[in-house]
Amino acid sequence: RFRHLFMYETEYYAFSERAANAYLGTALVSSSLSDKMRLQKMHNRVGAELELPYLGRTFVFGNAYHYNYYFRNAYYVGGVLQRHQIKDTDLSVGLQWHKKVGGFSITAEGEQTFVGKMTGTQLKGTLSYALDAQNKLSAGAMLHSAMPNFNYLLYQSDYKNYNWYHLDDFSKENIQ
């Protein structure tokens, strides 16, 4: 059978002050400070699932992850417009597998990005054993490689020291 998952999400962050606060450093404007960020994310996953008695349930999929992280402010430093947006689409392929054998339940998932900068490799696995109808023992492991959160890569503020663009400086984080 074929499966499809579509998810769209918008996030919004705003910081405002009537007057600059010396504690935060030098401000680019003296009053009505306003930092506004928006993040639009869309996941579009499509794939096929096959379930066989001896092999378990297997789902093979392709995923498109579109993101648009941006600030509405435009800052010029030395006459050069500073970057204010990270926008792209990451494409990946993956596999999910689940099998029950006696009281054991085994689940594995893997996904690999082959186009894009933000996502990378993800591997997850769990093994559980049902002790009885209400209790089970479970153990799992996860390996994940991806870029840090968007706000580590790009931020714009009315405060001088809170403006950065590091997309090209960072490498993917490896999380276990």
Predicted feature residues:
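Residues on the lipid-exposed face of transmembrane beta-strands in outer-membrane beta-barrel proteins
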Residues: 1, 46-50, 93-99, 125-129, ...
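Structural signature of outer-membrane beta-barrel domains
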Residues: 7-14, 65-70, 113-117, 144-148
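Outer-membrane beta-barrel translocator domains and adjoining extracellular loop/strand segments
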Residues: 14-21, 71-79, 119-125, 150-158
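Residues that define the transmembrane beta-barrel architecture of outer-membrane proteins
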Residues: 38-44, 87-93, 119-123, 171-175
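Outer-membrane beta-barrel translocator/channel fold
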Residues: 134-176
